[in-house]
Amino acid sequence: MTDHNEKLTAKSIPHSVWSADWLRNAEKQAADSLGLTLYELMQRAGEAAFTLARETYPATSHWLVLCGHGNNGGDGYVVARLAKSAGVAVTLLAQESDKPLPEEAEQAREAWLNAGGVIHSPDIALPENSDLIIDGLLGTGLTTAPRENIAQLIEKANRHPAPSFALDIPSGLLAETGATPGAVIEASHTLTFIALKPGLLTGKARDVVGELNYHALGLEAWLEGQAAPISRFDREDLPRWLKPRKPTSHKGSNGRLVIIGGDHGTAGAIRMTGEAALRAGAGLVRVLTRQENIAPLITARPELMVHELTLASVEESLEWADVIVIGPGLGQQEWGKKALQKVENSRKPMLWDADALNLLAINPDKRQNRIITPHPGEAARLLNCAVSQIESDRLLAADRLVKRYGGCVVLKGAGTIVASQDRECGLIDVGNAGMGSGGMGDVLSGIIGALLAQKLNPYDAACAGCVAHGAAADELAASVGTRGMLASDLFSTLYRFVNPDLKTINHD
């Protein structure tokens, strides 16, 4: 079974993401552009999958192939035929139906039978000596939980000791959303075809996709002529946002940031946000907080300028700062409410996080100059819905947040989504399970705030900040693991990713 604590992605993954619905409708156009039939395209998919499975699991000798009643099953028939011709023992189980197979899948099925293949009922016991499972049960058209008979087969496959290799997408994972409304194949490897689908990168995807691989099936040129609606971002994108500094840059030109928060007992939150902003390159960072927090914060991080939060200090700081971050440790009592009331009408770039979002949910408004960074619980409060609704379609939730609150939205979680009022959308393909601990959001707010202060536009600052944050955590996890990771541990690796021109970054 794959250890899913870390994201597993092969190096060849593209940076464009496409709706599965759009792709299904465009497949024939794509095939026509190369003079291919859909069956020939299916053969390419099967050949790519067989080749990768053979390379990945060279010692396997008995493959169990699970075929559904659609084109995903057709891919499975092609893989089975190629494996059989290569001398691999193959047991093929197929879900039958009263409905006819798609024409190209029927051709693949007939080719399997003509090659001497046998189709077994899915009700039989899975062969104990199978050492690789090929999952071709359900494809990208799935929009609900698998039917009971298919769910039972999925659960049997998951209990089998052999690893699973998913064709296009693990059966039971929704291609548009990454949701898993029912049983789902827990794949060790997934090979997706033609284009990346959103559901492979967000939601529950990381729990079930395993190592994600990609094959364009020869359609690269056609795909380049299409406009991708979603971008996938990882550490390779950092140089496009974070250029080397000019030798004459100084603390004033590197941006002035004010951070507001840290009510009683939450000095740690504001301290982490402040240090993260410094580590991400802000020239000057001022913190407005409770009087009791001033000495501990200055002692812990003397580079911070720390002042008591008063009416006068807020007004003066709003004039002084290039960018405002409010929310970490702010609380929801009168102290925090009054601070937010003073800040909310500023026309300067702002980032609202944590308790600022909880207060925003009570009094919603729309601002073009604001980034909000909710986790799923905060997003649910902002949209007055259940967390399960957020997680069932994270892309839709991000879109709804942008429409209601304006500006730019960072919907945090595994497969963070960044969406803007200009219809930009990015999936952040870094990060790991070690980031599920207190303070990670405070660090992210400081990083994004610092990049805003360095004159990145809100969408770019949000994307670059999320990538640097997650990449720093990935670098740390590679050396010490994910369990026990602290938010402040990221400071030891963050500088490498906000300086992507350094040659010491490990890209493995």
Which sequence ranges carry the predicted segments?
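Small-residue (G/A/S/T)-rich helix-start motifs and N-terminal tracts that mark the onset
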Residues: 2-94, 102, 189, 200-352, ...
